[in-house]
From Swiss-Prot:
Keywords: Amino-acid biosynthesis, Arginine biosynthesis, ATP-binding, Cytoplasm, Kinase, Nucleotide-binding, Transferase. It comes from Dehalococcoides mccartyi (strain ATCC BAA-2266 / KCTC 15142 / 195). The gene is argB. Its EC number is 2.7.2.8. The record marks K14, K226 as: Transition state stabilizer. Substrate binds at G46, A47, R68, N166. InterPro entries: AceGlu_kinase-like_sf (IPR036393), AcgluKinase_fam (IPR004662), ArgB (IPR037528), Asp/Glu/Uridylate_kinase (IPR001048), Glu/AcGlu_kinase (IPR001057). Catalyzes the ATP-dependent phosphorylation of N-acetyl-L-glutamate. It is an enzyme of class 2 (transferase). This is Acetylglutamate kinase. Belongs to the acetylglutamate kinase family. ArgB subfamily. It is found in: Cytoplasm.
Amino acid sequence: MNVSQVSNHIVVIKLGGSVLSSKDTSLKDIAALKQLGLKPVLIHGGASTVSDWSAKLGLETRLVNGERVTDDPTLDVVAAVLTGLVNKEIVAALLDMGVQAAGISGVDGATITGQMRATETGYLGDVTAVNTGLINALLDKDITPVISPVSFHHTKRPSGSRRLININGDPAAGEIAAALQAERLVFMTDVPAVKGKNGEALGEISAEHAAELLSSGTASGGMIPKLRSCLKATLAGASACIIDGRIPHMLVRELTEGNCGTTIIGQHLRRS
């Protein structure tokens, strides 16, 4: 990607909790992207921190299909840890680097509205709507939004249930990228690339190829929601990529040089 061609364009970046360590350079890269004229929008996870605090409080972590069962006490921890601790640590780090940043959650401004998925997973939900008003207001003031995926439980909310809902940050990132009509969606992960059916690392692939990886069962575990989100973003006009956030300055390299992980290209963006 030639940065000069996308100056002032929106790049949605999903930060996995596993890449937010003391040695990680992702936030420094975001500061550099701001200097290059891009408009980063950050969505973060923090599952390991939630699990740590759950253990400290004597709460059992239960997973269904790799996702956290979110009962009442767990929702308290998720909301406090993601929207409070993790979100504000990221914002403080960016401020310390000279980046004007503001931490919000999906609840604020009804940025992300969701509904419960199933009774057995409690307050774990899916995105039903994205309101970009608050995000755009921050971007217009040159403030970088840092978004926790704790969201507004409103759609088909059962009587007497809580107004907060826990939404996986991966699908949230794809929905936000699509709603903003972002130029790029970038997933910072702890794997080098998406793997093909023979275990090979994949570079640039079409959206159709990504869909085939999902339908065939080749993609598994945490790669499934990431690829689904990439497809959502490509349908809205973005390109999407999955890169290894553990490698120093990988984000800047991807957005200036490209070819750093796996890039998913929609049909309208495919090279002739």
